[in-house]
């Protein structure tokens, strides 16, 4: 049964720090322009009534492209991941520094979110109960940008 748990699952009593994005790696591929056009036509066709909550995406191809032109990135250890715009340069991403850490809970899953500004958020999910140590402000360095999971 333990084999089914992800390798990056937080262990009891673990402290999580926001990752240094200098070592982050892209693990998913960016969609090509042809793929984006194809999925826009399919997603926003007459079947869009199924996706009424996403109807705003279908008003303009550029809005759709902005939302869907993303690739998955992971921290060096694979513990945190994010969907990052393919229009963002890797060099800019690697220079980003965490500004805030927050924990939210949905059902039995805790989500530790490290905010790097400009909509860039790397997240870690765990079944453990997680909480932010301190006020969650990371501006003064990583030592204050920590969450504990028990």
Where are the predicted features?
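Mitochondrial intermembrane space
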Residues: 13-150
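N-terminal signal peptide c-region/cleavage motif recognized by signal peptidases
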Residues: 6-9
């Amino acid at each position: 049964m333990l084999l089914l748990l992800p390798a990056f699952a937080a262990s009891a009593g673990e402290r999580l720090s926001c990752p240094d994005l200098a070592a982050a790696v892209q693990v998913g591929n960016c969609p090509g322009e042809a793929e984006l056009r194809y999925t826009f036509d399919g997603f926003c066709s007459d079947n869009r009534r199924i996706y009424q909550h996403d109807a705003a995406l279908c008003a303009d191809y550029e809005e759709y492209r902005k939302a869907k032109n993303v690739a998955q990135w992971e921290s060096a250890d694979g513990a945190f991941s994010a969907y990052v715009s393919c229009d963002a340069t890797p060099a800019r991403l690697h220079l980003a520094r965490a500004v805030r850490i927050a924990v939210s809970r949905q059902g039995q899953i805790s989500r530790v979110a490290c905010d790097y500004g400009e909509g860039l958020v790397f997240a870690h999910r765990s079944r453990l109960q997680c909480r932010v140590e301190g006020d969650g402000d990371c501006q003064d360095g990583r030592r204050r940008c920590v969450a504990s999971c028990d």
